[in-house]
């Protein structure tokens, strides 16, 4: 199976009715976890999991998401289906999802100013270089299910056969993907909130 990437942008505020409709489509434990969130973070999370539900329906024929569990550092996964792997990320108005049959990690960041101190710490020549490096590191942490605290030390230890790349899915955004698979990446599927609701 090729690596499938989905993106939602912009994430607009959801009405209470829209949020409740998306919450109702989630497995019980995930619904409870997200019900306590408010505002933009809640809206991005609800859209991300609805995008995941649609992707799983497209690729595996699932009508509903199975229970979602979370690793020690927050990596979501399906405990009942190890061959359906995914990674979610959201940043300031955009959501990115990767679906694959092997472990995968994604990260998306909106380009924004970064202090000279941080750029120096990570040996980045400018903000764009900093964020490109950041999303690649973060996607590795997400694939491996380790804490992003590993990023503070600079280098993320290399893993044999791991493939990492960055791309710009949207103006002023950069995304990173990390996988140990040799499969190619399919075309980025762009969605809107209206298409999800």
Each language-model region and where it sits:
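Core catalytic alpha/beta fold that binds nucleotide/phospho-ligands
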Residues: 1-197
């Amino acid at each position: 199976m090729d690596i499938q990437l989905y993106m939602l942008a912009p994430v607009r505020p959801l009405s209470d009715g829209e949020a409740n409709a998306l919450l109702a489509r989630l497995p019980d434990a995930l619904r409870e976890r997200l019900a306590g969130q408010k505002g933009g973070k809640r809206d991005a999370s609800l859209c991300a999991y609805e995008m995941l539900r649609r992707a799983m329906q497209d690729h595996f024929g699932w009508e509903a998401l199975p229970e979602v569990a979370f690793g020690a550092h927050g990596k979501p996964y399906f405990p009942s289906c190890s061959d359906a792997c995914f990674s979610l990320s959201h940043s300031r108005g955009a959501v990115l999802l990767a679906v694959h049959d092997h472990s995968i990690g994604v990260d998306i960041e909106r380009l924004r100013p970064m202090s000279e101190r941080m750029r120096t710490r990570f040996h980045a020549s400018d903000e764009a270089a900093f964020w490109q490096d950041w999303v690649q590191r973060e996607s590795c942490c997400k694939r491996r299910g380790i804490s992003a605290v590993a990023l503070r030390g600079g280098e993320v230890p290399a893993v044999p056969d791991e493939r990492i790349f960055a791309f710009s899915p949207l103006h002023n955004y950069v995304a990173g993907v990390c996988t140990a698979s040799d499969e190619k990446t399919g075309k980025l599927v762009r969605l809107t909130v209206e298409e999800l609701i």
